[in-house]
Curated annotation (Swiss-Prot):
InterPro entries, A to Z: EF-hand-dom_pair, EF_Hand_1_Ca_BS, EF_hand_dom, S-100_dom, S100/CaBP7/8-like_CS, S100_Ca-bd_sub
Source organism per UniProt: Mus musculus (Mouse)
Full protein name: Protein S100-A4
Keywords, in A-Z order: Acetylation, Calcium, Cytoplasm, Metal-binding, Nucleus, Repeat, Secreted
GO molecular function, one term: identical protein binding
Positions of post-translational N-acetylalanine modification: 2
Induction: The mRNA coding for this protein increases in abundance after serum stimulation of quiescent mouse fibroblasts.
Superkingdom per UniProt: Eukaryota
């Protein structure tokens, strides 16, 4: 039986490949594929913003090598940044129960 972290890694990889390669390179997300992934898999990230300028900024920030596509490494960096933001948010929350030392 897979452990929760192993399952999470599987979801990260399989979600990328679910959307990549529908058009063009099967190992990269183009703009359309990325927008579909974010809209369906991370709806709270984009929120109600559906304007093209906001999405273009997200794409530009993710596309570190400026090839107009997001490869798996760029996708993982993006997810890592989201995870760090979530962690920082929860660091400010008091524990409900004292932590064991």
């Amino acid at each position: 039986m897979a452990r929760p972290l192993e399952e999470a890694l599987d979801v990260i990889v399989s979600t990328f490949h679910k959307y990549s390669g529908k058009e063009g390179d099967k190992f990269k997300l183009n703009k359309t594929e990325l927008k579909e992934l974010l809209t369906r898999e991370l709806p709270s990230f984009l929120g109600k913003r559906t304007d093209e300028a906001a999405f273009q900024k997200v794409m530009s920030n993710l596309d570190s090598n400026r090839d107009n596509e997001v490869d798996f490494q760029e996708y993982c960096v993006f997810l890592s940044c989201i995870a760090m933001m979530c962690n920082e948010f929860f660091e400010g929350c008091p524990d409900k129960e004292p932590r064991k030392k």
